C-alpha cells in the first residue's frame, strides 16, 4: 500500500490484493498533535472499499473532541462521543465486518479494561477492525 496522487491531485491510497487489510485487524496510529492522524484515518475510511479485503458494513467513530473534518465522512460513519458501554452490541452479525475508531480517547482508555478486551476478544469474535489514534503510544495506566 502506498500513497499517490489521483486525478484531482489529491492523495489516494493504491493497493493490490496483497496489501489489503484483513478483517478483522488492529491498527494503532500514533503521533503528535496536528500531525495528520485524523486526516489519514479519514482518507482510509473514504477508500475502505478498496483497502479492506471484504466490504465494510458498519463504521463507528468514537471521539473525544468533535472536529469539523468529521463532516466529510459523516454519511457513511456513525459518530459517538466517548466510549460506548456495550461495544459488541453495536456490531450485530448483519453489520459485520465493521470498523471501530477510537480517536483522542487515551485519557479514557488507559484505565479501561474494556479496551484491552476490545483489541483481543471483541475484535476477533465480532469481526471488527479496531483503529486507535493516540498521541502517546505508551500512556501510563493500569491496562496499558
Predicted segments with their positions:
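Conserved P-loop NTPase motor cores
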Residues: 27-49, 54-57, 64-68, 78-144
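Intrinsically disordered, low-complexity eukaryotic regions enriched in glycine, serine
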Residues: 3-7, 77-82
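Short, functional N-terminal and low-complexity linear motifs
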Residues: 6-11, 59, 134-136
Amino acid at each position: 500500500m502506498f500513497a499517490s496522487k489521483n486525478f484531482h491531485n489529491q492523495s489516494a491510497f493504491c493497493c493490490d490484493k496483497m496489501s489489503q487489510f484483513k478483517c478483522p485487524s488492529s491498527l494503532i496510529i500514533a503521533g503528535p498533535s496536528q500531525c495528520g492522524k485524523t486526516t489519514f484515518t479519514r482518507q482510509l475510511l473514504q477508500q475502505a472499499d478498496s483497502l479492506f479485503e471484504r466490504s465494510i458494513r458498519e463504521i463507528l467513530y468514537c471521539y473525544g473532541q468533535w472536529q469539523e473534518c468529521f463532516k466529510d465522512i459523516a454519511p457513511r460513519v456513525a459518530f459517538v462521543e466517548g466510549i460506548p458501554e456495550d461495544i459488541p452490541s453495536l456490531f450485530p452479525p448483519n453489520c459485520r465486518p465493521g470498523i471501530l475508531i477510537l480517536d483522542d480517547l487515551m485519557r479514557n482508555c488507559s484505565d479501561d479494561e474494556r479496551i484491552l478486551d476490545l483489541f483481543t476478544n471483541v475484535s476477533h469474535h465480532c469481526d471488527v477492525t479496531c483503529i486507535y489514534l493516540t498521541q502517546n503510544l505508551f500512556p501510563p495506566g493500569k491496562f496499558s
